[in-house]
Amino acid sequence: MSNADHAASTERFMDEMVSLMEPWGWSRTVARTFAYLMAREAPATLDEIADDLGIAKSNASMATRELVDYGNAVRLRQPGTKQLLFEAPSSQTGPFAMRSAMLCKMADLLDQQKQGMGEAATARLSRQSAFLRAMGEAIDSVIRDLG
């Protein structure tokens, strides 16, 4: 694959990632930065991210901070400098383990709320709680099997 073909393929990959992640609440910049880091062979500096994506360094900083905060990127310190490097995590289990725990907490909250509720509300809360627990358990199972 030529450099031009590789660049075009990476652009398509980043654009597709945007279309997939926007419904999940990711901004265009965050989704493109995530895809960029996933496609890179080596960690990137903020300057590289900003230059390669054609965005302001402040936007690259905001995007990487958000990705790091949710476990979708890793921040590395470059020895002997203040410069930071960013890379995609080697495992995606972190953000999904956090989501699994959140789903179980939501299910607990729904179960607590059922007390003293009417029949229809109790049934609705029970169904939602069961769904959330099943999703949390499914995530935990995948992490155990593949993580």
Feature names for model-found ranges:
Residues 1-24:
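N-terminal leader segment of winged-helix/HTH proteins
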Residues 23-24, 38-41:
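Short helix-capping/hinge SLiMs at alpha-helix to coil transitions
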Residues 24-29, 45, 78-99:
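Short, cationic-aromatic polyanion-contact patches
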Residues 48-51:
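A short acidic, leucine-rich amphipathic alpha-helix
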Residues 64-65:
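Short, hydrophobic-biased segments on the C-terminal half of alpha helices
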Residues 71:
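Glycine-centered, phosphate/nucleic-acid-interacting loop/turn motifs that mediate DNA/RNA or nucleotide
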Residues 115-147:
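C-terminal regulatory/oligomerization modules of transcriptional regulators
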